[in-house]
């Protein structure tokens, strides 16, 4: 179902766990100045979009509509599939820690975060 909520709420219990917005072409942004996040953004090869969303949602809100309004496909040799598994995992943990250190996170969300880490390790075979 569609929903609207405060960005911080989305960060604390959803984006804490993983990037739930895999298709940046499905996102509509307000006119923003990214100069405040630009340097930190450059540190990420895999999770840059995730970091960007968290930075935006710290100050804004999110509306989610599950209707397929565009299409997203993943190619066999996409960055997501070919990037080093350890680097991928480390950036996910780095983003989770970034969020955990800056926001109030409840115990259930923390448990989901650690469960996702276990799942990701198995998925990436590391």
Regions found by a protein language model. Give the residues of each.
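Generic detector of well-ordered alpha-helical segments enriched in charged/polar residues
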Residues: 12-16, 100, 112, 116
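Catalytic core of nucleotide-sugar-dependent glycosyltransferases
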Residues: 72-76, 81-107
């Amino acid at each position: 179902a569609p929903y609207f909520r405060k960005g911080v709420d989305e960060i604390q219990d959803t984006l804490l766990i993983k990037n739930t917005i895999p298709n940046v072409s499905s996102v509509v942004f307000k006119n923003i100045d990214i100069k405040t996040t630009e340097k930190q953004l450059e540190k990420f090869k895999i999770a840059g979009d995730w970091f960007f969303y968290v930075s935006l949602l710290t100050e804004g809100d999110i509306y989610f509509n599950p209707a397929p309004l565009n299409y997203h496909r993943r190619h066999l040799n996409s960055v997501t599939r070919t990037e080093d598994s350890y680097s991928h995992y480390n950036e996910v943990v780095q983003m989770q820690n970034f969020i955990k250190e800056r926001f109030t996170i409840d115990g259930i969300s923390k448990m989901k975060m650690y469960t996702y880490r276990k799942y990701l390790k198995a998925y990436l075979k590391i």
